From Swiss-Prot:
Keywords, ordered alphabetically: Cytoplasm, Lipid biosynthesis, Lipid metabolism, Metal-binding, NAD, NADP, Oxidoreductase, Phospholipid biosynthesis, Phospholipid metabolism, Zinc
Enzyme Commission designation: 1.1.1.261
Function: Catalyzes the NAD(P)H-dependent reduction of dihydroxyacetonephosphate (DHAP or glycerone phosphate) to glycerol 1-phosphate (G1P). The G1P thus generated is used as the glycerophosphate backbone of phospholipids in the cellular membranes of Archaea.
Descriptive protein name: Glycerol-1-phosphate dehydrogenase [NAD(P)+]
Pathway: Membrane lipid metabolism; glycerophospholipid metabolism
Location of this chain's protein in the cell: Cytoplasm
Organism name: Methanococcus aeolicus (strain ATCC BAA-1280 / DSM 17508 / OCM 812 / Nankai-3)
Main location group: cytoplasm
GO CC terms, sorted: cytoplasm
Residues that bind Zn(2+): D151, H232, H253
Amino acid sequence: MITTPRYIVIEENGINLLNDILLKLNLKNPLVITGKRTKKYISNFDYFYYFDYIDIKRNEPNKEFIENICNFDCIIGVGGGKAIDVGKYIAYKYNKQFISIPTTASNDGIASPIISQQGKSITAESPIAIIADLNIIKKSPKRLLSAGMGDIVSNITAVLDWKLSYKETKEPYSESSAIFSKTIAMELVEFVLSNDKNNLEEYPKKLVKALIGSGITISIAGSTRPASGSEHLFSHSLDIITKKLNLNINGIHGEQCGIGTIISAYLHLIEGNITIGEYENIKLSLEKVGAPTIGEQLGYDKNILIDALANAHKIRNRWTILRNGISKEKAEKILKKTDII
């Protein structure tokens, strides 16, 4: 069954509507999952905090958590990626309603029913309500807000990869989900490009709307396909290499996906699947919001970027423009052609 949010709030001081939404949903005993930095946003509400005891990498939360979870009728995730991921995972695992309250807008996980770990998708609970308080989000680091653009433009190449897979492998494909996903991305690109760099006051609001729409598209499709393709494989490949080599690089998902999108869009351009204008607009929109477009901005040297691209197709069994993989020699040429190295 497709589950989409019943309530979506995107406005200044939106968090003040939390009690009203809980009342409308007949939810009386929420469990709030948040972190040390984001706890302040929910401190005026008399709810129970539970964060440090939960680790989604383990098969089961600890005994204390299990004994307490029955006392709550919903989970509220307040924070960035981790708090919301943990919240919707726990909500799914223990059959609770989930409310998402993002404190930044760096990826579509704020609305999707999926958690991604090193390229693998873990099923989670779709939010029944999303409260995006623009006062809070606008105060989040600019780097995170620019990373959100990278996660949104990736929908463009994700949809191209999905359609390619349908043609070459007969993978099930939803035209409506694909159009919805691409439209969300293109509208944000057009907004960014049509406004002066110093006149993007509405960008956070437009970005949040796009990220929520992207997350909902995943729910409708029942798959991450509309929002995750070869560009995400590249990002996950970077994550794996970083961890393996124990590199001190704080890679942000959306930033890596943005660069991955430039790569994927270039490959689709070569095959005639997009125009040169569409390719250039992806890169220009990223630059305009301050997102990285070259490898050095991420902190990776060229050899790591080459390895990540050459091994990206191995991350998961998903047919993309990378197909069965590309050689390191070809990967280097692509990265040079796109000015990433």
